[in-house]
Amino acid sequence: EIVHIQGGQCGNQIGAKFWEVVCAEHGIDPTGRYGGDTDLQLERINVYYNEASCGRYVPRAVLMDLEPGTMDSVRSGPYGQIFRPDNFVFGQSGAGNNWAKGHYTEGAELIDSVLDVVRKEAENCDCLQGFQVCHSLGGGTGSGMGTLLISKIREEYPDRMMLTFSVFPSPKVSDTVVEPYNATLSVHQLVENADECMVLDNEALYDICFRTLKLTTPSFGDLNHLISATMSGVTCCLRFPGQLNSDLRKLAVNLIPFPRLHFFMLGFAPLTSRGSQQYRALSVPEITQQMWDSKNMMCAADPRHGRYLTASAIFRGKMSTKEVDEQMMNVQNKNSSYFVEWIPNNVKSTVCDIPPTGLKMASTFIGNSTSIQEMFRRVSEQFTAMFRRKAFLHWYTGEGMDEMEFTEAESNMNDLVSEYQQYQDATAEEDEYEEEEEDYHQEHDEM
């Protein structure tokens, strides 16, 4: 089972959409009753739902925020009544887009009541796989309190998987000037405490809506529609029986060659605007093509500027595994320079028999590409520009933070960027003696 946690305004909005999609796919109506048409919908329903005494299905979801607003709108939304009422945990003060408030002051006061609810949900599970957290990194609650919660859960359940869906701030779609601070402080935490981070980015989502879906003025609703489709795709092999049943751990084993490099780019195909799905049947070659297209990536980094360490594709619908494998091989052979050669067979694909609502087939792409450093680099530059002048710092030190923490977060993020760069440049045939010598020096320097 997976316990789902959503925090902050963004996390709650995305999370609410995610549950709408998942409920639709499993044939569960807003009151939690099942009205679907195939047993497959119920076969692994317990991954995300608890079955209550009267035959109702209740999401294993915890909703938290430091102000009541967003949660009220979730509660009054289409599926608001399906959640367990005790699982709404909220404060009144808000975090005011301040990471320190979410992580150290306001959030720290609320965290124990959130942990109680998480514990209750975890105790309800027979065999807990792990946790998935939806949050944004630009604000105060999702980033500050979200990372606080992740580190607390890490302490209490050290051997369970921790997956995050993290929305990174983007230069074009920004609501606060301190986003780079909040994001850097969060990444500092995610590198250490999360197992897998699915990186989403408003700018990239915005571009997809604008360019591919031809929406002239995309709303957050449209962006969240994309996110929820992708989240549903990433998790579909956990929710439905497929030929290759994956769980969070198998996903991690295939995708993470080095523990710190666990930030994934996501892609989705077919991208059609909401109204036009039914007109053309897509073929496996077409969705494979579209899925690998850099314009389809949900974060603002171009995979052609780096190399894939690993990648994984999840195809949904009735299709032959053979055809899928051929298409995937085809992509790798044509673009071999974009894959590191020192991890052979670094692309895996799985097929899940049940397509998303309204489509015959679809695919979701998860890639671990070194080009994601572009995004960290971008945030880091913005961070440095402000931090050099200590701009806005008093909001954080006023909550008891120390400048040292900023410096550490900054250097951790820069280390991450250079690690990605190092593996991007690495080849299979490098002179091994040199490497050993370097390692030897490094070890001695560190001592």
Curated annotation (Swiss-Prot):
The lineage of its organism: Eukaryota, Viridiplantae, Streptophyta, Embryophyta, Tracheophyta. Residues 427-440 have a biased composition (Acidic residues). The gene is TUBB2. It comes from the Eukaryota. InterPro entries: Beta_tubulin, Tub_FtsZ_C, Tubulin, Tubulin/FtsZ-like_C, Tubulin/FtsZ_2-layer-sand-dom, Tubulin/FtsZ_GTPase_sf, Tubulin_C, Tubulin_CS. One of its GO terms (biological process) is microtubule-based process. Belongs to the tubulin family. Tubulin is the major constituent of microtubules, a cylinder consisting of laterally associated linear protofilaments composed of alpha- and beta-tubulin heterodimers. Microtubules grow by the addition of GTP-tubulin dimers to the microtubule end, where a stabilizing cap forms. Below the cap, tubulin dimers are in GDP-bound state, owing to GTPase activity of alpha-tubulin. This is Tubulin beta-2 chain.
